Design a protein with these regions (language model features):
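Active-site-proximal substrate-binding groove within the catalytic cores of carbohydrate-active enzymes
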Residues: 1-164, 171-172
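Short, surface-exposed beta-strand/loop "edge" segments at domain boundaries and coil↔beta transitions
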Residues: 151-153, 175-177, 196
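Short, low-complexity, polar/charged sequence segments that are solvent-exposed and flexible
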Residues: 161-165, 186-189
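Solvent-exposed beta-strand/loop surfaces of large extracellular or lumenal domains
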Residues: 167-184
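C-terminal beta-strand-rich structural cap/linker in extracellular carbohydrate-active enzymes
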Residues: 181-201
Length: 201
């Protein structure tokens, strides 16, 4: 569904686009950053509520989410032929560490929240690095690789399509590495909330 979503639905309210529905609660900052990373990996329009992003905030939750949001917005204008105009393709397998994230789940027997609702804290495991692939009009394949955490991460991307040549770019489209004969797997080092675009031709 997420791949069809990229092609046919340009934007919806943030709570719905991340599967939260009307019973939205923020949960951990790490979970919000993971959702933002997935928004980028799926080629969706990044959206946040105004109170969630600020250039200056004393709230640690807001500072963390703001850092992720601003980092994840950078690739859109520089790789528009993939992220905005490309056709979604199956992403490669990514080997990386996992992280524990938490959110609130409605539960009448749970803890009473500030707004009066009752909920219990639920922990889920998710990858620290996510990826999505898009084919441009010229036939090249762009794979966006996203660090969903505030810590540096390493990941191994297993290429399903190797092509004749490949290049790895930073979010500002400066080149990091190039291969004349792409290997079957590529190791990527990502800074906090870092983004890379791997282009295979």
């Amino acid at each position: 569904f997420s791949y069809l979503y990229h092609e046919y639905i340009p934007v919806l309210g943030d709570g719905y686009s991340t599967g939260q529905g009307m019973l939205y609660t923020w949960g951990s900052a790490e979970l919000r950053c993971y959702r933002l990373a997935n928004t980028l990996a799926r080629g969706l329009v990044p959206t946040v509520y105004m109170e969630q992003v600020s250039l200056e905030s004393s709230d640690e939750w807001v500072r963390t989410v703001s850092q992720a949001f601003l980092s994840y917005c950078r690739p859109y204008p520089r790789f528009r032929e993939y992220l905005l105009e490309g056709i979604t393709r199956r992403p490669p397998k990514v080997d990386c560490a996992e992280q524990d994230l938490w959110h609130w789940q409605a539960d009448e027997q749970g803890e009473k929240l500030a707004d009066g609702r009752r909920a219990r804290k639920v922990t889920i495991r998710r990858p620290t690095v996510v990826a999505g692939s898009f084919e441009a009009e010229d036939g090249s394949l762009g794979t966006i690789i996203v660090n969903a955490t505030a810590q540096p991460q390493r990941a191994t991307v297993r290429l399903a399509r190797r092509g004749r040549a490949a290049a790895l770019f930073r979010a500002d489209r400066s080149e990091e590495q190039r291969w004349d004969r792409p290997p079957s797997q590529i190791g990527v080092s990502l800074e906090a909330f870092g983004v890379r675009m791997l282009i295979v031709r």
